């Protein structure tokens, strides 16, 4: 294991205490000691704030983390709390390969830049443990067959040879860094089942020191680990890199919304149903940028796997985290997953000693606000067609879908004519079979994603649905692409041991890979004859998946409606073959006896599910899969690389290139100066996601990125995905704002990455227009609506924005991670004042924009913006500068956080 985080050199508050377990004495930094010395009512704090407080208490150094940070945070929830940012230094960082590759590319580039000025490149090394889990690269090229897993894995290694060689070099070249090989599982499930310690116990100066396991991760669903009492959240790769290199994350003291759970889930409902309902409730509550902490009697009714499912969805409900404190169930899960019994005793003793152990009779913490969720009122549901917060009760799914068909095109509508509902197409498949697809036909049914494939209750449930369906003689229609991508090999183990996997295979839910697959858009192609027929007839087809995101254009370019559902519901809908059905009342199909088969005929009871989970999910299964996790993938271990400190960049590589972020960087940082002469390159509406800004999926051959790759000799069949090519800025610049579903209001009549180049009036690709503006040394601006940058913690959404020459984004509101990423890349986030937006101000996008920002700017200041139209008329308005802390102004001066880190390392060297 990598080196651990060091504690502070001095015990400033005399808070270092001891506890004893199993005959050993452990040191810890006592929160009670703060309260005893009169520094705040610490015992009343939310558990999540206590973990934050322990982190700053333990790491006070008088420079980065000061006494005032501790004293202030201890006064959380009182009138004495000051507007001082929290400097958070997590104990570790976790990466996945789509975001991890560009992060490691940046580290390699930092080393090159350091060496270029005569510095020591070894100064660029992670200072805390970093785990990278390779899970995002496998694609579902083949599905529904016995050899699908092997074929997809072969293609994964073939496509990603350059990337994997680079990551293999990194594990040798960097300290404190290890990589979990491909085909192991999904990062968050591997974290939950294996990597997380919950409490660290390290030897320091001859003494054993304990403290909470905390982390940041380059994936927004890092929050899944909150389910076991580990505080952590997703950040952009840029922020994670800075954290690896010793920089704290700064953020305002968070509000904490208490989510009080009462009651018990009814029979027939799942953790997925609850998670989707929680997402809807908390989105409506408004928790963006806030912590959510779960408490109340309902917690005791939820197994750890269900808590992890709910915590996983925190980005979808908008919260920074969705925290469940450590309790007896967390300890039970550590036992279930085969953790060391002595360490589990340390976890319990530490948490009890430091007031971090939750018990049913504990007094409720003090929260900013409380929302109550009654588990007994949860019903089976789905979410869609384009956002995870748009909840649809199962009983209302058909009715809702019919309304969505004819509703105006947008988040909850497709904008079709009423007669489109009855459209159908008939054609032959390659095997000669005839098929009929109608509006609403399900083209993809995928059991996928970290959210649900970590949960044995919903996976066993899906297997039981399959078993009952097969026994009754039901089959999946031949146009449905079915797939099963478990989050870890443990899942396969218990599906085999329970005898359910053969039934899932019988319905086409064969193993396709251990990774994110369909949930992130790696759904692979549909059969060519299906793609041709659907495209030719413009048929509206759908997907049903057990994922966490269903944004437009994400799952498959031809699939316009995407619905999130539990794994058992995915199987049920796959059997039906359409979302235009009332599963509660209509027959799903006809059985082998000629009788109609209904939903209740195949739906398992909780007693059936619980019995199989208890019988088949065992500690031995977890130990078996993880004891040799770093050695099992021979192809990974046979990759030949060097351990040299400096990476040998290959100019001909189309996967890995040295990015230009540090070219022509001055020794000293610049100043905050007014922005003049900006042209509008994009004018967008609400809910522009990071998928819209920087897609992860397929690269079209006629897109700027596709043309670049073809010029480099890459054939379209070898394009791979945008996500896999995030180590090459040339591809990613061209892919910025290239989502096929993005709608730019200043390129009317188009869909996709187009804009109007104002000097000539020509409609062209956003990339080509930006390059022309760059030649003219014209800065650019983007105008947007609410929730700009929602979705994945995709740093390339900000990196690409920067490289295109966009100097500022003016939006009605920003999602947390993307706003931070813009600042980290030296792009100014501005927010319209409440009640104003581009349309209310009469902005068409043709204007020249000026922003009066300078060295006097402070966090959340109002600045004057002028929009000068073609006739010279000026619209003047004020916007909020979304620097949320003083240090963010420094990042902006430096041109970005990595430039600041490099300048500091240069001085040290």
From Swiss-Prot:
| Cofactors that this protein relies on | [4Fe-4S] cluster
Gene3D superfamilies on file: 6.10.190.10, Aconitase, domain 3, Aconitase, domain 4
Protein's UniProt keywords contain Amino-acid biosynthesis:
no
Q: Name one Pfam family in it.
A: Aconitase_C
| Sites where the protein binds [4Fe-4S] cluster | 450, 516, 519
What GO terms in the biological process aspect are recorded for it? propionate metabolic process, methylcitrate cycle; regulation of sporulation; tricarboxylic acid cycle
Which pathway is it part of?
Carbohydrate metabolism; tricarboxylic acid cycle; isocitrate from oxaloacetate: step 2/2
Name the Gene Ontology molecular function terms of this record. Answer: 2-methylisocitrate dehydratase activity; 4 iron, 4 sulfur cluster binding; aconitate hydratase activity; iron-responsive element binding; metal ion binding; mRNA 3'-UTR binding; mRNA binding
Question: What turns on this gene?
Answer: By citrate via CcpC. When citrate is absent, CcpC binds to the sites near the citB promoter and blocks expression. When citrate is present, it causes a change in the interaction of CcpC with its binding sites, resulting in derepression of citB. When citrate is very abundant, CcpC activates citB expression, presumably reflecting a change in the interaction of CcpC with RNA polymerase. Also induced by decoyinine and nutrient depletion.
Instruction: Tell me what the record says results from residue 741 to E.
Output: Same aconitase activity compared to the wild-type. It is glutamate prototroph and accumulates citrate. Exhibits overexpression of the citB promoter and accumulates high levels of active aconitase
Zinc as a keyword of this entry, yes or no, is no
Q: How is the cofactor bound?
A: Binds 1 [4Fe-4S] cluster per subunit.
The record's statement on gene disruption is: Cells lacking this gene show a dramatic increase in the concentration of citrate. This accumulation of citrate prevents sporulation due to chelation by citrate of divalent cations required for proper functioning of the Spo0A-initiated phosphorelay.
Q: Which UniProt keywords apply?
A: Iron, Iron-sulfur, Lyase, Metal-binding, RNA-binding, Tricarboxylic acid cycle
Q: What is the effect of changing residue 450 to S?
A: Loss of aconitase activity. It is glutamate auxotroph and accumulates citrate. Exhibits overexpression of the citB promoter and accumulates high levels of inactive aconitase
Any one GO CC term of the record: cytosol
| Catalytic activity field | citrate = D-threo-isocitrate; 3-hydroxybutane-1,2,3-tricarboxylate = 2-methyl-cis-aconitate + H2O
List the coiled-coil residues.
none
Function statement: Involved in both the tricarboxylic acid (TCA) and methylcitric acid cycles. Catalyzes the reversible isomerization of citrate to isocitrate via cis-aconitate. Also catalyzes the rehydration of 2-methyl-cis-aconitate to produce 2-methylisocitrate. The apo form of AcnA functions as a RNA-binding regulatory protein which plays a role in the regulation of citrate concentration and in the sporulation. To prevent the accumulation of excessive levels of citrate, it binds near the 5' end of the citZ mRNA, decreasing its stability and thereby limiting the concentration of citrate synthase in the cell.
Instruction: Quote the entry's note on domains.
Output: Mutagenesis of different positions (F662L, R741F, Q745E, I810T and V853A) on the C-terminal region of citB gene product shows that even B.subtilis mutant has high aconitase catalytic activity, it is defective in sporulation. The defect is at a late stage of sporulation, specifically affecting expression of sigma-K-dependent genes, many of which are important for spore coat assembly and require transcriptional activation by GerE. It strongly suggests that aconitase RNA binding activity may stabilize gerE mRNA in order to allow efficient GerE synthesis and proper timing of spore coat assembly.
Q: How does it assemble?
A: Monomer.
Which family is it part of? Belongs to the aconitase/IPM isomerase family.
Q: What else is known?
A: Whether aconitase is active as an enzyme or an RNA-binding protein is determined by the status of an iron-sulfur (4Fe-4S) cluster that is essential for the catalytic activity of all aconitases. Citrate is both cotransported with iron and a chelator of divalent cations, including iron. If the intracellular citrate level becomes excessive, iron will be sequestered away from iron-containing proteins, including aconitase. Since excess citrate greatly stimulates aconitase synthesis via the positive regulatory effect of CcpC, the cell will gain the ability to metabolize citrate at a higher rate.
Descriptive protein name = Aconitate hydratase A
Q: What is the lineage of its organism?
A: Bacteria, Bacillati, Bacillota, Bacilli, Bacillales
């Amino acid at each position: 294991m990598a080196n651990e985080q060091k504690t502070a050199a001095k015990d400033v508050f005399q808070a270092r205490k001891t506890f004893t377990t199993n005959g050993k004495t452990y040191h810890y930094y006592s929160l009670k000691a703060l309260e005893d010395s009169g520094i705040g009512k610490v015992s009343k704090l939310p558990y999540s704030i206590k973990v934050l407080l322990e982190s700053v208490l333990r790491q006070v150094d008088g420079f980065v983390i000061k006494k005032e940070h501790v004293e202030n945070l201890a006064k959380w929830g009182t009138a004495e709390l000051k507007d001082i940012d929290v400097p958070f230094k997590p104990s570790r960082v976790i990466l996945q390969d789509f975001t991890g590759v560009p992060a490691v590319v940046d580290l390699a580039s930092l080393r090159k830049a350091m060496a270029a000025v005569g510095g020591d490149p070894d100064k660029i090394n992670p200072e805390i443990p970093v785990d990278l889990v390779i899970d995002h690269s496998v694609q579902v090229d083949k599905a529904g067959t016995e050899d699908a897993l092997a074929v997809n894995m072969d293609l994964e290694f073939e496509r990603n040879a350059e990337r994997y060689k680079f990551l293999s070099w990194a594990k040798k070249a960097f300290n404190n860094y290890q990589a979990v090989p491909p085909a192991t599982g999904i990062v968050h499930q591997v974290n939950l089942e294996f990597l997380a310690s919950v409490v660290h116990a390290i030897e320091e100066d001859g003494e054993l020191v304990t403290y909470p396991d905390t982390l940041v991760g380059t994936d927004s669903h890092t929050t899944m680990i909150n389910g076991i009492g580990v505080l952590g959240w997703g950040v952009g790769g840029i922020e994670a890199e800075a954290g690896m290199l010793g920089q704290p994350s700064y953020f305002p003291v968070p509000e904490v919304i208490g989510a009080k759970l009462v009651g018990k889930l009814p029979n027939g409902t799942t953790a997925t149903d609850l998670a989707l309902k929680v997402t809807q409730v908390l989105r409506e509550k408004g928790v963006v940028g806030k912590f959510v902490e779960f408490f109340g009697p309902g917690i005791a009714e939820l197994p750890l796997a269900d808590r992890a499912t709910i915590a996983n969805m925190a980005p979808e409900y908008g919260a920074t985290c969705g925290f469940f404190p450590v309790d007896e169930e967390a300890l039970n899960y550590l036992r279930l997953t085969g953790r060391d019994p002595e360490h589990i005793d340390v976890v319990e003793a530490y948490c009890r000693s430091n007031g971090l152990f939750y018990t049913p009779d504990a007094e409720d913490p003090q929260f900013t606000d409380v929302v109550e969720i009654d588990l007994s009122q949860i019903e089976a549901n789905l979410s869609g067609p384009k956002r995870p917060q748009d909840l649809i009760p199962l009983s209302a799914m058909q009715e809702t879908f019919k309304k969505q068909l004819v509703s105006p095109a947008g988040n909850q509508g497709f904008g079709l004519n009423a007669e489109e509902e009855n459209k159908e197409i008939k054609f032959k498949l390659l095997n000669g079979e005839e098929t009929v697809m109608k509006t609403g036909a399900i083209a993809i049914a995928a059991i996928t994603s970290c959210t649900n494939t970590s949960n044995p209750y919903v996976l066993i449930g899906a297997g039981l649905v399959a078993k009952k369906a097969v026994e009754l003689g039901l089959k999946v229609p031949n146009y449905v692409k079915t797939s099963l991508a478990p989050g870890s090999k443990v899942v396969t183990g218990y599906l085999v041991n329970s005898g359910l996997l053969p039934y899932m295979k019988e319905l086409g839910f064969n193993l396709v890979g251990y990774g994110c697959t369909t949930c992130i858009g790696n759904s692979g192609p549909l059969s060519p004859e299906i793609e041709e027929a659907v495209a030719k007839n413009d048929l509206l087809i759908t997907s049903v998946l057990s994922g966490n995101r269903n944004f437009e254009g994400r799952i498959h370019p031809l699939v316009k409606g995407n619905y999130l559902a539990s794994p058992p519901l995915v199987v049920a809908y796959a059997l039906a073959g359409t979302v235009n059905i009332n599963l509660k009342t209509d027959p799903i199909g006809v059985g082998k006896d000629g009788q109609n088969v209904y939903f209740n005929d195949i739906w398992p009871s909780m007693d059936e599910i619980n019995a199989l989970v208890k019988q088949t999910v065992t500690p031995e299964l977890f130990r078996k899969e993880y004891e040799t996790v770093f050695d099992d993938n021979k192809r990974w271990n046979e990759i030949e690389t060097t351990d040299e400190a400096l990476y040998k960049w290959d100019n001909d590589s189309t996967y890995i290139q040295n990015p230009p972020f540090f070219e022509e960087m001055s020794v000293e940082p610049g100043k905050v100066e007014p922005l003049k002469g900006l042209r509008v390159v994009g004018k967008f509406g609400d809910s522009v996601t990071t998928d819209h800004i920087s897609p992860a999926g397929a690269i079209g051959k006629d897109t700027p990125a596709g043309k670049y790759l073809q010029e480099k000799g890459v054939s379209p069949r070898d394009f791979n995905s945008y996500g896999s090519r995030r180590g090459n800025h040339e591809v990613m610049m061209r892919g910025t704002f290239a989502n096929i579903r993005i709608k730019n209001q200043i390129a009317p009549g188009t869909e996709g990455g187009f804009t109007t180049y104002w000097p000539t009036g020509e409609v062209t690709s956003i990339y080509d227009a930006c390059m022309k503006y760059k030649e003219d040394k014209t800065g650019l601006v983007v105008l947007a609506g609410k929730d700009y940058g929602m979705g994945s913690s995709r740093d390339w959404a900000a990196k690409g924005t920067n490289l295109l020459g966009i100097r500022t984004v003016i939006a009605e509101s920003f999602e947390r991670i993307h706003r931070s990423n813009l600042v980290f890349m030296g792009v100014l986030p501005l927010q319209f004042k409440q009640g104003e937006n581009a349309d209310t101000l009469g902005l068409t996008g043709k204007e020249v924009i000026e922003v009066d920002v300078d060295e006097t700017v402070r966090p959340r200041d109002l600045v004057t913006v002028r929009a000068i139209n073609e006739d010279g008329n000026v619209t003047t308005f004020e916007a909020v500068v979304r620097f949320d802390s003083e240090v963010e102004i420094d990042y902006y001066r430096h041109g970005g956080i990595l430039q600041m880190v490099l300048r500091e390392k240069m001085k040290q060297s």
